[in-house]
């Protein structure tokens, strides 16, 4: 079996999706996927540099003492720290991209004021449930919860419209909700390395025939 290295810092999830489909449908090789979720590059590059905040790999345990322009920050990268809470993020009303991968988070503050937030990346944290505050985000399109001990997808998320990209790889999820009709805009769904039965995988494919799904 041939293994492909799929994750790079510069790869976008849309690039990954097309690459995954190429391998899955036009090659006899097997694609092993994990953590290949990223923001769309063209949209990311459109964010002015002074609206981007990079605090990746800074050893942060909290955000006390960090100064943010709440009306200006579009993009916030807090990947690979040791954060256990991010309460200060709740006031960043202009935020569209939020990266919190590889921290120590088990909960989020209320994010209901972040009406512009479109993409949130939460992989490799300690979430046992999908944070319910995501229900209150009307612009949300992308959610990455891969590598968390999440065991089920709540009904409110199954009914949430407007979603385009979801990743639940390397979680404890074994089945999806029965009704997935609200995910009609979904473009890609990562369900890699889950303990799903063949029947459940077949049901998901049938329910979402136009979605790029990676099991």
Predicted regions and their residues:
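Leucine-rich solenoid repeat scaffolds
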Residues: 174-215
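Conserved hydrophobic beta-strand positions in leucine-rich repeat
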Residues: 53, 74-78, 98-100, 120-122, ...
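Bacterial signal peptide processing site
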Residues: 37-39
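Leucine-rich repeat
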Residues: 69-72, 89-95, 111-117, 135-140, ...
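C-terminal motif of bacterial Sec signal peptides marking the signal peptidase cleavage site
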Residues: 33-35
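LRR N-terminal entry segment and analogous cap-like coil->beta motifs
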Residues: 47-104
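The feature encodes a structural signal of leucine-rich repeats
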Residues: 63-66, 85-89, 107-111, 130-133, ...
